From Swiss-Prot:
Disulfide bonds join 28-74, 32-48, 39-61, 45-68, 49-70. The lineage of its organism: Eukaryota, Viridiplantae, Streptophyta, Embryophyta, Tracheophyta. Stable under extremes of temperature. This is Floral defensin-like protein 2. Residues 75-101 form a propeptide. The presence of a 'disulfide through disulfide knot' structurally defines this protein as a knottin. Residues 1-25 form the signal peptide. The keyword Kinase does not apply. Belongs to the DEFL family. The gene is D2.
């Protein structure tokens, strides 16, 4: 009985983590740290972003504050796959333990 409760607790926690990783997928944004002044033209902003060590792939000027914002794909696909494999392994181990008892 205690193993079943533990199994369901781990499964629910894993699903919550999986859902959290899924909501973060998409595009990561950050303000360009070396940009000075008002951002009016996209081309210099893109150049500034690509020169950053964070390996940004694109950039654009924000509409209201006119700041240079750098963008890149978030690396959550790998994290999601890893998390899914870990959850599967944990679930299989718990089921195996329940069967042995």
């Amino acid at each position: 009985m205690a193993r079943s409760i533990c199994f369901f607790a781990v499964a629910i926690l894993a699903l919550m983590l999986f859902a959290a990783y899924e909501t973060e997928a998409g595009t990561c944004k950050a303000e360009c740290p070396t940009w000075e002044g008002i951002c009016i033209n996209k081309a210099p902003c893109v150049k500034c972003c690509k020169a950053q060590p964070e390996k940004f792939t694109d950039g654009h000027c924000s509409k209201i504050l006119r700041r240079c914002l750098c963008t890149k794909p978030c690396a959550t696909e790998e994290a999601t796959a890893t998390l899914a494999n870990e959850v599967k392994t944990m679930a299989e181990a718990l089921v195996e333990e329940d069967m042995m008892e």
